[in-house]
Amino acid sequence: MNDRAKEILDFWFDDMVVEKRFKRDNNFDQVIKNKFKGDHDKAISNEYDDWQDEPLSTLALVILLDQFSRNIYRDDKKAFEFDHKARLIVNDAVYNGYLDKMDEYQRFFMLLPYIHSEEIIDHDRAYKLLDNYLSDHPNYVEIKKFWKEHTLAIKRFHRYPHRNNITVSYTHLTLPTTPYV
């Protein structure tokens, strides 16, 4: 594993960071932006695609695209813009057996792009992998509940409603053929 990938993983799995991962924290977002925005830019421009040759480097790439995007671009549609690439990388990682070479905490973040997806097929993939790869996770019950809540939102709304204010384009409302104007 290269030094940058190791630095990303060391940062993300540090005990101090664990408490901040899923909370809105502008200071934490700024730390990620300062430390890893350059890496994120390289990842989205395919400069880090060779990281996919090794399981833990692949995980670092997924964290850059899936997790750090949400911190770097909070409240901006760019926060979700790279989810598709992260999912494609995860698909390859699963196919290549990389999950077998990770611990349960690493597997969780490798699979999280499926739950971040607004496509129900990705949620189905996540559930198929959940019991096989995360049943030994100490927070397995909470993870399953968390994922179920996300999946129910997708089934009900076909998207994550909390993203509406960030991602919805209102141009369709001004088209002359729109019956609701």
Predicted features by range, described:
Residues K6-N34:
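N-terminal export signals and maturation junctions of secreted/periplasmic proteins
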Residues K33-D53, K85-G97:
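Short amphipathic alpha-helical segments and their helix-coil junctions
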Residues D49-L59, L99-Y105:
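Structural motif
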Residues S57-F68:
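Amphipathic alpha-helical regulatory regions
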Residues N71-K101:
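Helix-adjacent hinge/juxtasegments
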Residues L99-K101, Y105-D136:
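Acidic/histidine-rich alpha-helical segments that form the ligand environment
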Residues T171-T177:
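Conserved small/polar residues in nucleotide/adenosyl-binding loops
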